[in-house]
């Protein structure tokens, strides 16, 4: 037989369950603008009916419901959308870093403009043409020297500026690695707290949110994967457990966070600039590998992410040359190497022609440029030869004693269009240059077309980076909108829920009033006769 107070207990349970739902709704509304917050909902389930099956069960028709209970408060989140978002976030981080590095390089190269290298060299070639018309004119000779000095200074400016930006990118890499290690440690700490709470049968939803927010941030720097591991004990079935975060090194997983342990990311050949024992700064020779708490991973294992984009700008090693020196590739190392090749080739070929000509005083074998004994660093070391201090030594003539002969000035102006693939180049008045014997680093095209090709490729790379950045941003935004449609707080929806739960609460309270009136009639209104 049912208890007289059975209805009171069922109504009380209804009030408590609806109250929990109202409190959760209040929590959602309060955090509507909190970054990373996932809306929560109370899972309601009926309590076990009465009676339970057994030999001594009361003889009543069927089982009677006993009310409702809040089984859990859980997040409304779709894990698959998290995976999609983090993948797109990694791609966006990579293309943002690459686009930024190229944009800074384009600002330095400043093509086309009146102060860039191509324009400066055009003015130098034009000065040589003018000198060929007036080889005896001291003003024309002075202009040639000044234009040559402008070319040298432009090489220096470009080389120094690109080197400085590369250094700045290296500093940015160090800051990024420090931030990555900080995020890993914070995720580890959250894993610890979650592992202490879940076995007691609770869902630490706010800790889950904070952990997911940190992993979202981490995905901007590196392409990562996440594995879930149960914490055991009395954890609820929907408990998310601890997260293991990893990167792929080929087909092997390298764990950045594993339960309550966080790895440290560093550069084996790098330097520790803040004294914390972590080599967060990349080596000056370029990145070869990364160290993850003793596990070495290749730079190429970083498929996407801001860190890879920065390293590609800064420079990475691809092996060693015949002398055992590392071969460094990357946006800035490549452009610096190209400028060195250009400065060396330009200066060497120009000198080879100039030294065969004659000055006003009949002297010959005077170099015009100096400081180009090696290809490496030539853009920073090239300078005007001391012989050019005497303007009479500028070799505009192809014949000794013919001061009005400007044919060698024409030869010098034609250096801009010499095909570097030719073994030997013949010029006016029997002057020729054996290009094959000069061991030039550029062996195709011309001095001019090589530079134009590099600038053109820079423009193409910049356009591609900006296009991919825009595409990645659009895709990430699309996934984020889907994720927000599932997980974010809708104030309109919460207001409807509030009204729904309020009415249910009021109905349960009214039920108690009804039962109270029934009991009052039973207790106080029965068994009294004659009143």
Q: Where in the sequence are the language-model features?
A:
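Structural signature of extracellular appendage/secretion-system components
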Residues: 1-531
